[in-house]
């Protein structure tokens, strides 16, 4: 699977360079998400621009990513193609995952999550 990660101070950006996220690549994608979380990445932003198709195992991998980062920070998808967004919406995953249009909005979502988590622990 083609997958690149750029690490920044408050988050990392993962780019999936794969047109199909299906049963052939989803186990590796799940593993990548879990490894990043175990390596101390608090929030992960995922660039989905190159992904044209996901099947149920691909959606499952995205859910694993969402779960892996929900405790420490946030999991954000951006640049989601129309077809993939339809599949995410049909499966109602758009109700549990943070999905935004671009990288700037994704970075803002990370900042907002940090502020909200900070308020929860300050009380």
Residue positions per predicted region:
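General small-molecule cofactor/ligand-binding pocket signal
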Residues: 4-6, 78, 98-100
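Amphipathic alpha-helical interaction surfaces in cytosolic regulatory modules
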Residues: 21-97
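Residues that form or immediately flank small-molecule/cofactor binding pockets and catalytic motifs
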Residues: 10, 82, 104
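A charged, well-structured terminal subsegment
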Residues: 101-123
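STAS-typified acidic loop motif
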Residues: 2-34
